Regions:
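Acidic, PIN/NYN-like endoribonuclease modules and their adjacent C-terminal/linker elements
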Residues: 101-129
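Conserved glycosyltransferase catalytic-site signature
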Residues: 6, 81, 97-98
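Hydrophobic helix-cap positions at the C-terminus of alpha-helices
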Residues: 30-31, 70, 107
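Active-site-proximal, substrate-binding regions of enzyme catalytic domains
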Residues: 49, 53-69
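Membrane-interface junctions
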Residues: 34, 90-93
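Acidic catalytic patch
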Residues: 41-45, 64-91
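Short, well-structured N-terminal submotif of metal-dependent ribonuclease cores
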Residues: 1-40, 55-60, 121-122, 129
Length: 129
C-alpha cells in the first residue's frame, strides 16, 4: 500500500500541471491495483476538500461527488471510510466538522460539543453557551 499526499490527488483530478498530472495519472491508473492500493488519510480528504473549494472554486456538492468517485475506486483505500461517506452525505456544515462528529460517534462518543452555531444544527452536536 502507498500513502497518497493530497497534491497527488489534486494533480490527478485537476490536471493543471501537465507534467505532474501525467505522473499522478500514471500512478493512480497504472501502478495502483487491488494488490497495491493507494491509501488516503482523513487529513488528505480534508485538505482535498479545502484545496478544491478555495483554490479551484469547486462547489461543496462537486467536491462531495468527486470524493465519492475516488472512494469507488477498487485501487484506493480510505482511512475511516464509513465516517467520510456519512459526513459527505450531510446537507449542511463543513466536511471537517462533519467528519469530526462522525469519527467521535464511531468511537462511542455520546455527543459532540462546539461553540459553532452552524455546526450545532447537526443532530447530536450540542452548542455550549
Amino acid at each position: 500500500m502507498i500513502a497518497l499526499d493530497t497534491n497527488i490527488l489534486v494533480r490527478y483530478l485537476v490536471q493543471d500541471d501537465p507534467a505532474q498530472g501525467r505522473i499522478a495519472t500514471r500512478l493512480l491508473e497504472g501502478e495502483l491495483s487491488s494488490d497495491n492500493q493507494g491509501f488516503v488519510t482523513i487529513v488528505a480528504v480534508l485538505e482535498l476538500d479545502w484545496v478544491l473549494r478555495t483554490q479551484y472554486g469547486f462547489s461543496p456538492q462537486i467536491v462531495s461527488d468527486t470524493i465519492f468517485g475516488l472512494m469507488s475506486s477498487p485501487h484506493l483505500t480510505f482511512e475511516n471510510s464509513d465516517a467520510i461517506k456519512t459526513a459527505l452525505g450531510f446537507q449542511h456544515g463543513d466536511l471537517a466538522d462533519n467528519i469530526l462528529h462522525e469519527t467521535g460517534a464511531a468511537n462511542a462518543c455520546t455527543r459532540t460539543v462546539t461553540f459553532d452555531k452552524k455546526f450545532s444544527r447537526l443532530a447530536g452536536v450540542e452548542l455550549l453557551t
